[in-house]
């Protein structure tokens, strides 16, 4: 039972899908055909006066366009919608936001229009007054991601027929529309209904009548000239046929002429924009060239400043070594006879070794302290070998400390501490006595 039931359900499901796809295709075809007829009717009706809401042709066209924009729309409940039901205005508001100088914000700020349906109808009227309805729809169709988010498969806006729709709407740019959006004329509660009767025309062909109907119509006539041979068929003469052809040609000419005027106006607008852009491009190019020249001049100036600073720097470097050379010979005299004698430090000390007073050249004070420490160590070892202490018991008067203290204590003149860091240290080997004071 179960496999047969599943097979029967699948068999019933296939025709239902085919029927639904056929219905969707028929809806698309009907809406596009009626829209084409409606646009032609508006172009024929328009003379010199603008079209407003009182025109029955416009009311029908607005209803048709609303049905096209709502075809296969995902009209689920939305939290962001004021009336709880989404309409095509939610799609237009997002997809047409990229249009330059759009009217989306103007419609959103209208106080007397609150529902999404009323805002969508106001947008249709405002776009027609701006003569930009085709531009809005073309921009919306380019945003395929947003279009697929708002419409189901099979919608007119997701099919190739959408390009046919935009081509139809171009001709409406040649018509002047005038609407009042501040009043209560825009109704957002009742749905729009399309009137198909102006576009229905039935012509019965001669082959449709059977021979029996033909005999009955002929036999039932009471008089020969009371009715024609086929009362249900209009007798078209040559003059009427030519007149109908002329009317069709006139309609086509009006449509083409309206489109031609719109395209010429569009070309003039684009030419004006192109001229403005060319002027702007020329101005920016000139500005760039001026800035390049200015930057080149600044670069040359900076290079000259750098060269001048380098010349000044090279001129200052030799003058820095000259004071050092002048300062070196002046170090000998003040330090002579300022070193304390070792004999005054200890009465039991051996005679002074003249080899201690030697002339040395040191690169820094560190070398001086190292040399003096080595000499003190050698003297200490010599003193221990002889068995005689050369200094006071309990103290370690090294020559480095003694020499430093003596020099600092006995020079009241203008010889400061940096003089000790010079390149030479002069020691006299004369036999003059040291200063009176000796360290205790």
Curated annotation (Swiss-Prot):
The keyword Coiled coil applies. Residues 52-184 form the RUN domain. InterPro entries: Run_dom (IPR004012), Run_dom_sf (IPR037213), RUN_RUNDC3A (IPR047338), RUNDC3A_B (IPR047340). It comes from the Eukaryota. SMART domains: RUN. Keywords: Coiled coil. Residues 262-317 form a coiled coil. Residues 213-233, 374-402 are annotated as: Disordered. Pfam families: RUN (PF02759). Belongs to the RUNDC3 family. PANTHER family: RUN DOMAIN-CONTAINING 3 PROTEIN RUNDC3 (PTHR46251), RUN DOMAIN-CONTAINING PROTEIN 3A (PTHR46251:SF4). This is RUN domain-containing protein 3A. It comes from Xenopus tropicalis (Western clawed frog).
């Amino acid at each position: 039972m179960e496999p047969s039931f599943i097979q029967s359900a699948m068999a019933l499901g296939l025709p239902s899908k085919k029927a639904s796809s056929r219905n969707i295709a028929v809806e698309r075809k009907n809406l596009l055909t009626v829209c084409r007829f409606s646009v032609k009717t508006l172009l024929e009706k328009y003379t010199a006066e603008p079209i407003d809401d009182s025109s029955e042709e416009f009311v029908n066209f607005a209803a048709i366009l609303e049905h096209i924009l709502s075809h296969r729309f995902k009209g689920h409940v939305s939290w962001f919608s004021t009336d709880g039901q989404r309409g095509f205005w939610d799609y237009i508001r997002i997809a047409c936001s990229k249009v330059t100088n759009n009217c989306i914000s103007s419609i959103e700020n209208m106080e007397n229009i609150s529902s999404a349906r009323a805002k969508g109808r106001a947008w249709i009227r405002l776009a027609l007054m701006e003569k930009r309805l085709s531009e809005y729809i073309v921009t919306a169709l380019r945003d395929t991601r947003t279009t697929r988010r708002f419409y189901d498969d099979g919608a007119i806006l997701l099919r190739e027929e959408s390009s046919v729709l935009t081509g139809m709407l171009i001709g409406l740019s040649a018509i002047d529309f005038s609407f009042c959006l501040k009043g209560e004329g825009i109704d957002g509660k009742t749905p729009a209904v399309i009137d198909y009767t102006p576009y229905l025309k039935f012509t019965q062909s001669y082959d449709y009548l059977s021979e029996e109907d033909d005999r009955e119509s002929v036999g039932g006539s009471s008089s020969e000239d009371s009715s024609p041979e086929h009362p249900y068929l209009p007798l078209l003469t040559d003059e009427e046929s030519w007149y109908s052809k002329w009317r069709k040609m006139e309609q086509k000419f009006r449509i083409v002429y309206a489109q031609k005027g719109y395209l010429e106006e569009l070309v003039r607008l684009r030419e004006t924009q192109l001229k403005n852009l060319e002027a702007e491009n020329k101005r920016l190019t000139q500005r760039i060239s001026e800035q390049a020249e200015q930057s080149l001049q600044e670069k040359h100036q900076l290079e000259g400043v750098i060269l001048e600073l380098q010349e000044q720097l090279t001129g200052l470097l030799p003058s820095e070594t000259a004071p050092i050379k002048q300062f070196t010979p002046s170090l000998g005299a003040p330090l002579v006879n300022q070193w304390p004698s070792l004999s005054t430090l200890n009465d039991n000390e051996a005679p002074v070794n003249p080899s201690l007073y030697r002339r040395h050249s040191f690169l820094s004070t560190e070398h001086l302290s190292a040399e003096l420490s080595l000499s003190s160590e050698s003297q200490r070892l010599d003193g221990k070998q002889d068995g005689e202490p050369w200094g006071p018991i309990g103290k370690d008067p090294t020559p480095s400390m003694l020499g430093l203290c003596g020099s600092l204590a006995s020079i009241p003149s203008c010889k400061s501490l940096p003089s000790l860091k010079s390149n030479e240290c002069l020691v006299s080997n004369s036999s003059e006595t040291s200063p009176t004071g000796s360290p205790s």
